[in-house]
Structure formats: C-alpha cells, structure tokens
Curated annotation (Swiss-Prot):
GO terms for molecular function: ADP binding; ATP binding; proton-transporting ATP synthase activity, rotational mechanism. Its main location: plastid. PANTHER family: ATP SYNTHASE SUBUNIT ALPHA, MITOCHONDRIAL. This is ATP synthase subunit alpha, chloroplastic. It comes from Oenothera glazioviana. The lineage of its organism: Eukaryota, Viridiplantae, Streptophyta, Embryophyta, Tracheophyta. The record marks 363 as: Required for activity. It is a peripheral membrane protein. It is found in: Plastid, Chloroplast thylakoid membrane. Its EC number is 7.1.2.2. The keyword Hydrolase does not apply.
C-alpha cells in the first residue's frame, strides 16, 4: 500500500497557489435597440469612447459617433443586413486605424486599407490612426520648394509649393481630375509619393484614372483609395482620412507626398446623411454644424515639416465641383477659406477650346513666388503682367472698332500668349520647357506667326532645344537660374528653328 507523503502534497498545493493568477476579463457590451440605413442604436456600452470601434455579433464593425445618456449611435462599416434587434455588441477598445507600409505603393485599396485590385493581400507591420492630429506650429516650416504640375498656366502664375493646400474648383466636365492626374504624372522621377482618393465617384471613372496612371508608369509611386458611389456613407466619410494617414506615414519618414481628394463635397454629403440619421441638428443646406471641422481637420494635416522632423511634406489638392460656377455655396466657401489658394476652372473657357480651362484672373496661390525657382520667377512676371493687360484690353476692344497700332499689337501678343498656355492632356512639361515656351512668347518671337501655327512651332522648338541644345536644360536644372548663357542658347535655338519652320510651311 502506497504511503501518502503529506510534505509533498503540501508543496504541490503551495506551488499551485503561488502560480495562480486571478484574471478577470471585463468586456464592455451592449444590445442593439434599432438598426437600419447604416445606423444602429445600442443600449449599454457604458464606457465606450467617441470614435471607438465596436463589433457586432455577426462580425460587422461600426464606429460609435453619438454618445447619448440612454443609448449610443453607431455608424456601420458595411451593409449590416444580418444585424438583428436584441443582438449583442462589444466595444473593442480601439480607435479606427489602418495598416501602413511601402507595400501599398501601386495598389488600389478601400477606406479600410483592404486591397480591391485583385492582386492579393498587402503585408504590413505598422499601423496609423485614421484620424491623427495635424502638425503644430513649431513642427512646420514655411513652404519654399516648388511642386511642379507640368502645366504652364499653374507653374508660372499660380505656383504650388510642397506642403501647400491648393483647391481645384469648377463645374462638372471642366477637366478638374485631368489637372490632378497630370500633376501625378509629372512627379515621375521627382521622388514624390502620390495618393489619389476617389470619394463617391463612379467605379468606371476610377478605373479610367487607374488605367491612365498604369499606362504611363505612374502607379509605381501612387496609391489609389477608392470608395464608389454605391459604398456605405461611413466608408465614403472615412476614405479621405485613410488617404491622409497613408500620406502621413511617408511624410514623417522624410519623404515628399502629394494627396488628391476627389472630391470633399461628396464626403460632406455622406457625413450629412450620417448626421441626419443620427438625429443631429441640421444647419445651412442641412449640413451638420461641424462640417467645417470635417474638412479643416483633414486639410490641416497637409504640411511642410520642420528641419527637426526631417523636412518631409504633404501637399493637398482637394477638388470641389460647383453648380453653374457658384462658388458661394456652403462647401466651396468652406474649402476656399481653409486652403492656400484655388485654381478656378471655367466651363466657358473649356467650351472655347482653352484647355486646361484655368481662369487665371480669379485663380490665386497664397504661397506665390516662394514656390518657384529663380529661373521661373525671371520669366513668369512678364507673362502675368501681359496677360492681365490683355484681358483688360480685350474687354475694352469689344466696344471699339478703330484701335491704334500699339493696341492691336498688344491684343495680337495676348492672343498668342493665351495660345501658349494650352496643353494636351497627359503631356506635362519640364521646368526648362516651360521657361523656353514663356520666354519665346513674352519676347515677341511668336508675333509673326498665325495663331494656328503657334502650338506647332512651340512643339518643334521644344524638340529642337532638347536634341540640339541639351546644355540649356542642364543649366536650368543645375543652377535653377535663367543665366545669360542659357538666354543666348535659347535665342540661337529660336532663330534657327524659326527659319526651319518657315521653310517647312512654304513647302
């Protein structure tokens, strides 16, 4: 018969007592009172945070937006068709965040950073909050480097700098998205990461943009965040913040980023829908009172960081659609007041064949020539002045038939300058090409040509300088100054090409 050893038993009991770890897991839960239209009202969830993610019994995730005394208003990140009254909900203890990494480059994702391009999962080891605070005053420095768009009208007269917020505004079908995509194409080789956020767009329009970027090799440095028109309002509301979080990831790693929001007015409409369903009081145009804050907290995240933080930058180009050119509507005025200037696209100019249809008279950049290299400043000043005088004269000339020779010459020069601002889509120009184009126009070298010949001559001149006078581009790119040597090279090239062109035209 085995003997019972009391000391061994007591040791085992003592060990077990020492190893015992009393773990109490408290889960913050609630019950669904009502669900429908992408909104759920929950009883319970007493300690939930504003903006916290909550998980429903069947797996749908929601965001707690309304914290009321008797219930919590939750917006659903999905259709929520399987959620039933009385089903349980638990708080996750997490605020909305997304995974971030270099692997996102070249991919098309949704507002939850999940790939929607059918090319498999995206690996990531880090995450960022979808809504993080904008850099403070000390964390920023003033904008001083240009972000070239490749469009003469913008780079010469409405320059955009790295870290600036510049609004692109105009009626539908005036080429707003084309200006933004051309800017992305022009960043090739400039070490700029681009993020294109499509909010409430047609899926076919987004596919068109993605194809255009892929064909020209721009997807290598671009991320597309897309929520189509049929997406839940919650995801359309979140998409811009997801794009901003991805751009911030690169900005804080000392990189330069460009983010395009197309368009924030659709985000405001999604937010209005959510707010009205949550029974928040409506204000002007039925938008909630904090719709200004919706956009300001998004656009303030664009910045040029200080030297201490590595001088990374995030440049934002929000695109807003107007109705019949009315910029005094609620959302356009809000975004105009937040941004550092606006590029106004006119339907009249577009229909008159002036493309890009930029109305230079009412477009403005509040950063100005600080966002231009010295060479561009040297030639752009004269262009601005001559176009302003031309616009004034043109209006006056409509009421007068007998104009003196000087006025006729000035009108002829203005028409040719307006012609040189025209550009084909997806054909951005380098800074050197822009400088030679502007110099040719403002110094009267185009005056002898017919208006119909101007663009053809300029195209051939740019090719001629690129092949026969490569030193010109080297001087501009290395010194950033339009030196006397560069000027002499350009004058020779213009004369030589002019002679060649006139001979060809006679044949």
């Amino acid at each position: 018969m085995a003997t019972i050893r009391a000391d061994e038993i007591s040791n085992i009991i003592r060990e077990r007592i020492e190893q015992y770890n009393r773990e109490v897991k408290i889960v913050n839960t609630g019950t669904v009172l009502q669900v429908g239209d992408g909104i759920a009202r929950i009883y319970g969830l007493d300690e939930v945070m504003a903006g916290e993610l909550v998980e429903f019994e069947e797996g749908t995730i929601g965001i707690a937006l309304n914290l009321e005394s008797k219930n919590v208003g939750v917006v659903l990140m999905g259709d929520g068709l399987l959620i039933q009254e009385g089903s349980s909900v638990k708080a996750t203890g997490r605020i909305a965040q997304i995974p971030v990494s270099e692997a996102y480059l070249g991919r098309v994702i949704n507002a939850l950073a999940k790939p929607i391009d059918g090319r498999g999962e995206i690996s990531s080891s880090e995450s960022r909050l979808i809504e993080s605070p904008a850099p403070g005053i000390i964390s920023r420095r003033s904008v001083y480097e240009p972000l070239q768009t490749g469009l003469i009208a913008i780079d010469a007269m409405i320059p955009i700098g790295r870290g600036q917020r510049e609004l692109i505004i105009g009626d539908r079908q005036t080429g707003k998205t084309a200006v933004a995509t051309d800017t992305i194409l022009n960043q090739q080789g400039n070490n700029v990461i681009c993020v294109y956020v499509a909010i409430g767009q047609k899926a076919s329009s987004v596919a068109q943009v993605v194809n255009a970027l892929q064909e020209r090799g721009a997807m290598e440095y671009t991320i597309v965040v897309a929520e189509a028109a049929d997406s839940p309002a919650t995801l359309q509301y979140l998409a811009p913040y997801t794009g901003a979080a991805l751009a911030e990831y690169f900005m804080y790693r000392e990189r330069h980023t460009l983010i395009i929001y197309d368009d924030p007015s659709k985000q405001a409409q999604a937010y209005r829908q959510m707010s009205l369903l949550l029974r928040r009081p409506p204000g002007r145009e039925a938008y909630p009172g904090d719709v200004f804050y919706l956009h300001s907290r998004l656009l303030e995240r664009a910045a040029k960081l200080s030297s201490r933080l590595g001088e990374g930058s995030m440049t934002a180009l929000p695109i807003v659609e107007t109705q019949s050119g009315d910029v005094s509507a609620y959302i356009p005025t809000n975004v105009i007041s937040i941004t550092d200037g606006q590029i106004f696209l006119s339907a009249d100019l577009f229909n008159a064949g002036i493309r890009p249809a930029i109305n230079v008279g009412i477009s403005v950049s509040r950063v100005g020539s600080a966002a231009q290299i010295k060479a561009m400043k040297q030639v752009a000043g004269k262009l601005k002045l001559e176009l302003a005088q031309f616009a004034e004269l043109e209006a006056f000339a409509q009421f007068s038939s007998d104009l003196d020779k000087a006025t006729q010459n000035q009108l002829a020069r203005g028409q040719r300058l307006r012609e040189l601002l025209k550009q084909s889509q997806a054909k951005p120009l380098t800074v050197a090409e822009q400088i030679l184009t502007i110099y040719t126009g403002t110094n009267g070298y185009l005056d002898s040509f017919e208006i119909a010949q101007v663009r053809k001559f300029l195209d051939e001149l740019r090719d001629y300088v690129k092949t026969r006078k490569p030193q010109f581009e080297e001087i501009i790119s290395s010194t950033k100054i339009f030196t006397e040597e560069a000027q002499a090279l350009l004058k020779d090239a213009i004369q030589e090409q002019k002679e060649l062109f006139l001979v060809q035209e006679k044949v």
